[in-house]
């Protein structure tokens, strides 16, 4: 069953996910995960927030990186990410130049490393990402 993607928008939600320190840095992105909080959440919803800092470049570069990450998440998360967690995807400089297929592999590997990969897909995910904290 495909989960529904919702967005994290409030700063407090981003800080809560970051405070848990459950993260994995892949060459193309950083993924953070935390148990979802809130009473209005549906059991099959995934909440995802995106952030790209000014280190990545000007606003054109940051928005391009954010668009690439949003599309990768839309492709990977409904089938592979565990529901009941909030996720924050952080863009890096490499997000812009990294081939899209490798960005998808980075996302799958990061899901596996933070323990958020659905059990049915755990055997399929590559473990190619190297830790960079």
From Swiss-Prot:
Keyword RNA-binding among UniProt keywords: yes
Gene Ontology annotations of biological process type: tRNA 5'-leader removal
Tagged with keyword RNA-binding: yes
GO CC aspect terms: ribonuclease P complex
Pfam families recorded: Ribonuclease_P (PF00825)
Record EC number: 3.1.26.5
InterPro entries the record matches: Ribosomal_Su5_D2-typ_SF, Ribsml_uS5_D2-typ_fold_subgr, RNase_P
Reaction(s) this enzyme catalyzes, per UniProt: Endonucleolytic cleavage of RNA, removing 5'-extranucleotides from tRNA precursor
Top-level lineage group: Bacteria
An annotated Gene Ontology molecular function: ribonuclease P activity
Entry keyword set: Endonuclease, Hydrolase, Nuclease, RNA-binding, tRNA processing
Function: RNaseP catalyzes the removal of the 5'-leader sequence from pre-tRNA to produce the mature 5'-terminus. It can also cleave other RNA substrates such as 4.5S RNA. The protein component plays an auxiliary but essential role in vivo by binding to the 5'-leader sequence and broadening the substrate specificity of the ribozyme.
Subunit structure: Consists of a catalytic RNA component (M1 or rnpB) and a protein subunit.
Entry similarity comment: Belongs to the RnpA family.
Name of the protein in question: Ribonuclease P protein component
Gene designation per UniProt: rnpA
């Amino acid at each position: 069953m495909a989960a529904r993607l919702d967005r994290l928008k409030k700063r407090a939600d981003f800080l809560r996910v970051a405070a848990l320190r459950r993260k994995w840095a892949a060459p193309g992105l950083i993924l953070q995960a935390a148990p979802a909080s809130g009473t209005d959440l549906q059991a099959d919803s995934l909440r995802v927030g995106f952030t790209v800092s000014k280190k990545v470049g000007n606003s054109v570069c940051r928005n391009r990186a954010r668009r690439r990450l949003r599309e990768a998440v839309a492709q990977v998360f409904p089938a592979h990410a565990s529901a009941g967690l909030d996720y924050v995807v952080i863009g890096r400089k490499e997000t812009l130049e990294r081939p899209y297929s490798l960005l998808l592999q980075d996302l799958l590997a990061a899901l596996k490393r933070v323990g958020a990969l659905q059990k049915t897909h755990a055997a399929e995910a590559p473990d190619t990402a190297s830790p960079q904290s």
